[in-house]
Curated annotation (Swiss-Prot):
Main location: cytoplasm
GO biological process: regulation of cell shape
Binding partners and assembly: Interacts with GLUL.
Gene coding for it: PALMD
Name assigned to this protein: Palmdelphin
Record location of the Glycyl lysine isopeptide (Lys-Gly) (interchain with G-Cter in SUMO2) cross-link: 125, 179
Native organism: Bos taurus
Cellular location(s): Cytoplasm; Cell projection, Dendrite; Cell projection, Dendritic spine
Keyword vocabulary terms for this entry: Acetylation, Cell projection, Coiled coil, Cytoplasm, Isopeptide bond, Phosphoprotein, Synapse, Ubl conjugation
Residues making up the signal peptide according to the UniProt record: none
Residues that bear Phosphoserine: 135, 321, 370, 384-385, 497, 514, 519
Length: 550
């Protein structure tokens, strides 16, 4: 009650203080108005006094004096009113100060008497405990027409609390046996296995280590006996972790995944695999599929690959020209080097065959093949050339230089694929091209060292970007231009037809006075057993200038 009275007194003090502040503000406004009137009358009195000095008649002078006296009287009244209002304002300010002081005192008393929220909650609890002595049954007894068998929900809950706590009356909906291995050093628990059990057959054997009303955990030793020694209760976090591990173990799929398998070689990923992959038993079939993907008939190609593996491994000069580069792992490089030899034979154009025939008839220490072997391969090429001519418009290939002989087979192989744009056979374009009469003019410039002599072997230097393209550099280069015989792209494979302005390589060497004279068959094989660079450069030039070579 004291707190309520203090609150009322405080509110009254605040109200009085507010009224006094309003009166003070009104009186100050009135003082401002009185001061304005006072200034106006003073100015008027001075003006009349100044006019009075210039008037000579007596009547006017008397009237001016009376008016001046009235103004002086009003000025005095206004001055007194201003002084009175200022005094009243001072009194009101003092009263306001007094009220503020009383308000502060009341506020201090109120704070000392006022209860906090905790005190209020505590008092409410105490009052509730005091009034709880009244029975619930007595409350419901006052309700008319209530059946005697009715039991309130509160009473039913209180009566059933003891029954619900009984373990025997609770039925398990789901049971699971989890085998857990605990590390005594780190204290971590690992789930080894989890087996669901029928809820009807479950018997709560062992020691209860956890129970939150929804889940119960019993500890049982490995021999299905209760382990009383060293068994402690489990924390909720540990129980949740065990359940999570058990659920993850059950959700794991036994399916084993492997790398994607592509039937079409052109659908394989461009990123090379880092892991070593061993060739499977179906390698011959894969080779057959890859060869068929180029649009050529390769019956008998697998037989040639199998028979030539021992001879061609490490020494064979291979050419691969797929539609795009296909990466291979290191373990597949040897097989990949052997496969494209047949593909290059299928992709050889008719006007390129005469140059290749010279190389096939001559035994080469690099290829390791006998002349009879070369003849067999040539006959196989001739038998397979018609389907190549049929699909010549659709097949696109590139010329790739041979691998160096001293390259380690275990190292990765980098291949360069050079593409050329197809030139359409238009009469207008032929007119624009100066000197074009339907014949390809292939010119080869060979830098040779004639002063050093023939005994010094040529050393191959490799291009920094393409290690498979060889450029032969002698120790001291002396440029001597040589021109290769002109070749018609439509030349037949069985015979050569000479053209005008075509000079053979032998005639060029004789005209230039070269000390070295070779037959057309010997020129193409160097002294060290490697392929003559003129043949390789001529192939590149012909592929670059040909109409149907892309």
């Amino acid at each position: 009650m004291e707190e309520a009275e203090l609150v009322k007194e405080r509110l009254q003090a605040i109200t009085d203080k507010r009224k006094i502040q309003e009166e003070i503000s009104q009186k100050r406004l009135k003082i401002e108005e009185e001061k304005l009137k006072h200034q106006h009358l003073k100015k008027k009195a001075l003006r009349e006094k100044w006019l009075l000095d210039g008037i000579s008649s007596g009547k006017e002078q008397e009237e001016m004096k009376k008016q001046n006296q009235q103004d002086q009287h009003q000025i005095q009244v206004l001055e007194q009113s201003i002084l009175r209002l200022e005094k009243e304002i001072q009194d009101l300010e003092k009263a306001e100060l007094q009220i503020s002081t009383n308000e502060e005192a009341i506020l201090k008393k109120l704070k000392s008497v006022e209860r906090t929220t905790e005190d209020i909650i505590r008092s409410v609890k105490v009052e509730k405990e005091e009034t709880s002595g009244e029975s619930v049954e007595d409350i419901y007894a006052n309700i008319p027409d209530l059946p005697k068998s009715y039991i309130p929900s509160r009473l039913r809950k209180e009566r059933n609390e003891g029954i619900e706590d009984d373990e025997q009356n609770r039925k398990a909906l789901y049971a699971m046996e989890i085998k857990v291995e605990k590390d005594l050093k780190t204290g971590e628990s690992t789930v080894l296995s989890s087996i669901p059990l029928p809820s009807d057959d479950f018997k709560g054997t062992g020691i209860k280590v956890y129970d939150d009303g929804q889940k119960s955990v019993y500890a049982v030793s490995s021999n299905h006996s209760a382990a009383y020694n060293g068994t402690d209760g489990l924390a909720p976090v540990e129980v949740e972790e065990l359940l999570r591990q058990a659920s993850e173990r059950n959700s794991k799929s036994p399916t084993e995944y492997h790398e994607p398998v592509y039937a079409n070689p052109f659908c394989r990923p461009t990123t090379p695999q880092r892991e070593k992959v061993t060739p499977g038993p179906n390698f011959q079939e894969r080779v057959k599929i890859k060869a068929n993907g180029l649009g050529n008939d390769v019956n008998g190609s697998i037989h040639n690959i199998d028979n030539g593996l021992a001879e061609e491994r490490g020494n064979n000069v291979n050419h691969i020209s797929p539609a795009r580069p296909i990466p291979h792992p290191r373990s597949m490089i040897q097989q990949a080097e052997e496969m494209p030899h047949i593909q290059q034979e299928r992709l050889m154009t008719p006007w390129e065959e005469p140059n290749v025939m010279q190389d096939k008839y001559t035994p080469s220490p690099k290829s390791g093949l006998s002349p009879s072997r070369a003849l067999v391969e040539k006959s196989e090429r001739q038998s397979s050339s018609p389907p190549c001519q049929e699909d010549e418009k659709d097949i696109r290939y590139n010329i790739v230089h041979s691998l160096p002989s001293d390259l380690d087979e275990k190292e990765p192989v980098t291949m360069i694929f050079m593409g050329y744009q197809q030139a359409e056979d238009n009469e207008e374009e032929k007119k624009l091209l100066t000197g074009y009469d339907g014949i390809i003019h292939a010119e080869l410039v060979v830098i040779d060292d004639e002063e050093e002599g023939e005994g010094e072997a040529e050393k191959p230097a490799y291009h920094p970007i393409a290690p498979h393209s060889q450029v032969f550099q002698p120790a001291k280069p002396t440029p001597l231009p040589r021109k290769r015989a002109e070749v018609n792209p439509h030349e037949n494979t069985n015979h050569k037809s000479p053209h005008k302005n075509s000079i053979s390589l032998k005639e060029q060497e004789e005209s230039l006075g070269s000390p070295i004279h070779h037959s057309p068959l010997d020129v193409q094989i160097a002294g060290d057993g490697t392929e003559d660079p003129s043949l390789t450069a001529l192939r590149m030039r012909m592929a670059k200038l040909g109409k149907k070579v892309i």
